[in-house]
Amino acid sequence: MTQQPLPTRTEEISPTRKSTPWSRYEEAVLGFRNYWYPAMLSRHLRRKPVAVQLLGEKLVFVRSQGKCYALENRCPHRGVPLSMGTCEFPGTHTITCRYHGWTFDLSDGLCVAAITDGPESSIVGKVRVSSYPVEERKGLIWVFIGDRQPPPFEEDVPEDILDEKAVLGIRLTQRIGNWRLA
């Protein structure tokens, strides 16, 4: 059995060709998106929304009644970061944009109110921001920003991390640069 040599450049991979060991790497312009990623320490998410940028995505994390949520950090109305917003209506699992009061459901990103437009607003139920699956484990908040259904968390994260007896040493650093060269 003979093996074909691997292509040396992305352009040489035809769309009809089966994947190569490097295909996923070459296609991952902004990183490997279809995985669970640790986004922040659980203790850093309290009452106020927190902005995080991960793999080129600007996210906002919100804790509502003890549960964590992640949304796109951009109000579709004027582009204001939702991380500047507030949870105006306790118990409703929503975040409200500070600029014009558009309010989004934390579970699915759907606009549920437009405070400045009143209860008859035509945008309610029609506009949404992206929402992302979140898991909180071992003192970390994990997020899946892929373009498909997330795999079960336990199957995607190394089992050593989930071991109850394991102690995680965590260091936070911000890296700006090309992830492929890191």
Predicted features and spans:
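Rieske [2Fe-2S] iron-sulfur-binding domain
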Residues: 6, 40-167
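Short amphipathic
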Residues: 35-43, 167-176
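Intrinsically disordered, low-complexity regions enriched in Ser/Pro/Gly/Gln/His and often acidic
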Residues: 15, 29-30, 125-128, 135-137, ...
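Glycine-rich, aromatic-lined ligand/substrate-binding cores of catalytic
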Residues: 179-181
